[in-house]
Amino acid sequence: MLGKSTLLSILANQISASSGTIKWNKTPLTGRDHSLQAIYLMSEQNLFNKENRLKKIMKDTALLQGAFNQTLADKMLADFELNPKQKINQLSTGYRTIFKTIVALCVPADYVFLDEPILGLDANHRVLLYRYILEAYENRPRTFVLSTHIIEEIANLIEHVLILDQSRIIIDDDLETVLDHSYQISGPKEDVLAYCQELPILASEQIGTLYTNYLYTNYLYTELPADRVIPDRVAIKHVDLQTIFIKLTEKGREQHV
């Protein structure tokens, strides 16, 4: 089964696909030297020499990538209280993640893949890292692909959403479009069920007497039918990205509390 980390590694040309072809500008990606500089993957896997000091890794990265934003790197190292003279194997999981993300933000690649860039980070460090991702984008707009399970925290960072479930892409759309088509419809069960007839229900739950259906209307409609009368006891609202992600990947399940 193809997971997100495996997919990113294939796209970054770090591993080969068992079937199919990845193309870069209509040319197979495998073996293309220019793609190695155009795409950069930061992942949980540590590809750096564990005995190297951070400053050595940054210097080698600059040679390999052709450039490196040392000014931004120095600023981030100071803010995260990382000593460039440390060896990478002396860092904790969280600080190793931070350093690898620093390197990713400072290379000149047009496509930067960040696979779980907040692994092992506390809340304060996560907020600081998000700020630097935005700063790196504002300084030089390019494509950042963030792979994470903590969706709620990155919702304000992203413009486009791709949701992968059981090796299938189930959502590939702009964030605004996804949110515009995501609904929560709540009220007494009989009223909710009556209103939601023939609508694309993802999941349902019941807490006491409150019954809720979750819908993603982009499957069948551009919006909820305008001619359908909303019962007085039924409330309809949009839901956030975290909620719709959960409901999309657990669709068909009914929960009772």
Give the predicted meaning of each segment:
Residues 203, 207-257:
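C-terminal coupling/interaction segments
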Residues 112-116, 121:
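Catalytic Walker B motif of ABC-type/P-loop ATPase nucleotide-binding domains
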Residues 41-100:
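ABC-family P-loop ATPase nucleotide-binding domains
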Residues 12:
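Helix-to-loop junction immediately C-terminal to a conserved catalytic motif
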Residues 172-173:
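ABC ATPase "signature
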Residues 123-125:
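Helix N-cap at the start of a conserved alpha-helix in ABC-type nucleotide-binding domains
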Residues 20-35:
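Conserved ABC transporter NBD signature motif
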